[in-house]
Each structure stands twice: as structure tokens, then as C-alpha cells.
From Swiss-Prot:
It is found in: Bacterial flagellum basal body. GO terms for biological process: bacterial-type flagellum assembly; bacterial-type flagellum-dependent swarming motility. This is Flagellar hook-basal body complex protein FliE. The gene is fliE. One of its GO terms (molecular function) is cytoskeletal motor activity. HAMAP family: FliE (MF_00724). InterPro entries: FliE. The keyword Phosphoprotein does not apply. It comes from the Bacteria. Residues 9-27 have a biased composition (Low complexity). Belongs to the FliE family. PANTHER family: FLAGELLAR HOOK-BASAL BODY COMPLEX PROTEIN FLIE, PTHR34653. GO terms for cellular component: bacterial-type flagellum basal body. Residues 1-36 are annotated as: Disordered.
Amino acid sequence: MINAISPFQVQNTQNTQNATNQVNNSQKTDSSNQTSFSELLKNSISSLNESQVASDNMTNALAAGKDVNLDEVMIAAQKASISLTAATEFRNKAVEAYQEIMRMQM
């Protein structure tokens, strides 16, 4: 038995083809814009350092009696603390993964 092709099936086929083309195009652009792991790590460490320095500067200004909003100082300190905790956890996971690889038998 032969079924007729409905207009909805044609539209679905065209939508699927368009989506496939978009995925292929985005994969091509993503591969050309990728940054290396070392650059990503360097940028992350730089950002972490900047947040730590900003927090220290605000804390020192507050301790020196300068006109600094306590809320902003506490928020900056918490952001720096969370960033440092995340970086420490990332380092721990990286070391753990390295140790696991070193335990593998060849």
C-alpha cells in the first residue's frame, strides 16, 4: 500500500534539514574559535587573582576607615572566597584524574 506524502511530512523534512545545516555550520565556527586549555586556565587564574586583589583592596580600605560600603566589601570577599574554593576543587579533581591515569596498566 502506498501512502500519499502529506504537506506536514515535507515541512518536517525541510525543518530537519535546516536544523542539520545549522548544527554543521555552528560546528565549523566553533572549531575555528576554540581557545586552548592553557589559555582558558591562564584566563581563569588571572580572573581569580583579580577578584582576590579587589577583595583585599576593599577590605584594607574599610580597615583604614575610608568611606567604603560594608555590603560591597562583604560581597567582594564572598565572591573571592567562592572563586578560590572553586579553583581549589578544580585543582583537586585535576590531580585526582592525573593520579588515576598514572595507576592505569599499559
